[in-house]
Amino acid sequence: MISIKLNFKYWLTLLFVCKFCLAQEKLIPVLIVDGQNNHDWVSTTDSIEATLRSTGRFTVEIDTAPQTKSIKGIRGPKADAPNYLKESYKNFRRIQQGAEKEDKESQEEEWKNWNPFTGRHQAVVLNYNGREWAQETKESAVEFVRQGGGLVLVHAANNAFRNWDAYNEMIGLGWRPANFGDCIKWEVLKNKPYVACVDCSSGHGSRHPFQVNVRQLDHPIMKDIPTTWMHGKDELYHNMRGPANNLTILSSAYSNPK
């Protein structure tokens, strides 16, 4: 009798552990890439991470691009300062310039070796707009997407890498100058996208709240999202341009209804 109880407890524990393991395996591993941006990428990453974790559906890691190390200088002596102060300042500048050179060389090596696309994640959230990546890193990013990885751009990430053809293909449309690829907009009356102005550059107006309209109701990404919903006060990009190949527009909004 005791043996039966022990076995029952054993199997109950085993089932619980297995169920826990399966639950853990179902979590989607996501990577946030940041480190440079024309917006406050630190706060944005914190917000993205908190949002993803709050769903209970994701594991989240963050990979920050190599950072520039700043070496603070000191103000040089005035013209009428004693010679010993001038000599001391010259010596300091020689030391500082040497340190800056070493730091630059070290940083270049860091950039060369930095590659967040390790294949351990199912999706990468790109909160980055800055320096061009090393060729190997760019190739890894392309291969990641080619193998089915998800690439999600946050705001100014579509400003990045204008001259990287593969990136333009992956994102479809981005913040680009006039005559760069096609400018795609949504024709409300015909309920389909169309090629718009040739000579218009990407941009945005003043920050304002705007209504988002879902255009692909049956798309899995839009599941359980209202047909129309209000977005808070924010910048809304317009005249996005690019190759626009294999592009599906899921939603749209007016940058300016007029």
Predicted regions and their residues:
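Intrinsic disorder/low-complexity segments, especially N-terminal tails and targeting/processing regions
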Residues: 4-6, 19, 30
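Hydrophobic h-region of N-terminal signal peptides that target proteins for export
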Residues: 14-23
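Helical hinge/lid and interdomain linker segments adjacent to catalytic or ligand-binding clefts
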Residues: 24-27, 31-161
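Short, solvent-exposed coil/turn elements at secondary-structure transition points
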Residues: 36, 66-68, 157, 173, ...
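Catalytic beta-strand/loop cores that center a nucleophilic Ser/Cys/Thr
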Residues: 53, 59, 108-109, 190-258
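A glycine-rich, often tryptophan-bearing local segment used as a flexible ligand/cofactor-contacting loop or short
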Residues: 117, 126, 130-220
